[in-house]
Swiss-Prot record:
Family: Belongs to the THF1 family.
Record: transit peptide: 1-45
Protein name as catalogued: Protein THYLAKOID FORMATION1, chloroplastic
Keywords associated with the record: Chloroplast, Coiled coil, Membrane, Plastid, Plastid outer membrane, Transit peptide, Transmembrane, Transmembrane helix
Organism phylogeny: Eukaryota, Viridiplantae, Streptophyta, Embryophyta, Tracheophyta
Stretches assigned to the Chloroplast intermembrane side: 46-197
Domain of life: Eukaryota
NCBIfam families in UniProt: PS_II_psb29 (TIGR03060)
Length: 293
């Protein structure tokens, strides 16, 4: 993914939409996709069930740390309404990944990670029927991880606003400048360089990519320079951005199938109602004719 910085998230999604030509006669319940993100089994049944398996965070020895099942249960308890599975499946897999990162000894919250999650979440939930529900799900999700949803949103917005004022050179040259955002990057670089209090994750990689996109960076070498300045492994970032791009493509296909399914159900329901109305009219006319004899 050498030229990853020249491709925007919106361009990825639009490209996937052009490529997704899925037959409407295909059963939506059998549609599945797999990626290295472990997001799979997408269909349109509403589901709020939680997995029975329990995954313990082996990177910490604290006996009182919550399990994955605890975190998922907390999320489902906070948001009780059914979520269409095309969204819920990815959310459930994502919360597993984020739980395991969240409870590592080396984990420390940072705004780039928050920007990455907000970006992924907003891409995933784009087109969700209710904005109110979308916000409620976000709140329940972050609070299930014992973090602050308002901080996630505020920090993501702050980074986005800053990135829009940057260019390729100023984005990389943060170490020679003073400022709130520059100090955040310096702190990340220091922690990543000493391996003390820094936990790299795929969401962090997405956060970096989002910064480059907002700064209108088209030079593919800038990502490499930014990774070097932050003491982050460029190969890991490239790999994880490839996975995310694949996820976006699969989500477009799944949502298209969901849309087709809903439209077919509406059509069937309309046909049934029309048939029922015709039968009622016919019966009434028959009764009227019989009564008039």
């Amino acid at each position: 993914m050498a030229a990853v910085t020249s491709v925007s998230f919106s361009a990825i999604t639009q490209s996937a939409e052009r490529k997704s030509s899925v037959s409407s006669s295909r059963s939506i319940d059998t549609f599945r996709f797999r990626s290295n993100f472990s997001f799979d089994s997408v269909n349109v049944r509403s589901s709020n069930s939680t997995s029975r398996f329990v995954v313990h965070c082996t990177s910490s020895s604290a006996a009182d740390l919550p399990t994955v099942a605890d975190t998922k249960l907390k999320f489902l308890t906070a948001y009780k309404r059914p979520i269409p599975t095309v969204y819920n499946t990815v959310l459930q897999e994502l919360i597993v990944q984020q739980h395991l990162t969240r409870y590592k000894k080396s984990y420390q919250y940072d705004p780039v990670f928050a920007l990455g999650f907000v970006t992924v979440y907003d891409q995933l939930m784009e087109g969700y029927p209710s904005e109110e529900d979308r916000n409620a799900i976000f709140k329940a999700y972050i609070e299930a991880l014992k973090e602050d949803p308002e901080q996630y949103r505020a920090d993501a917005q702050k980074l986005e606003e800053w990135a829009r004022t940057q260019n390729a050179n100023t984005l990389v040259d943060f170490s020679s400048k003073e400022g709130e955002i520059e100090n955040i990057f310096k702190d990340i670089a220091q922690r990543a360089g000493t391996k003390d209090g820094f936990c790299y994750s795929r969401l962090f990689a997405v956060g970096l990519f989002r910064l480059l996109e907002l700064a209108n960076v088209t030079d593919p070498t800038i990502l490499e320079k930014l990774c070097a300045a932050l003491n982050v492994n460029k190969k890991s970032v490239d790999r994880d951005l490839d996975v995310y791009r694949n996820l976006l493509s699969k989500l477009v296909q799944a949502k298209e199938l969901l849309k087709e399914y809903v439209e077919r159900e509406k059509k069937k329901r309309g046909e049934r109602e029309t048939q029922k109305a015709n039968e009622t009219v016919t019966k009434c006319l028959g009764d009227y004719q019989y009564a008039g004899r």
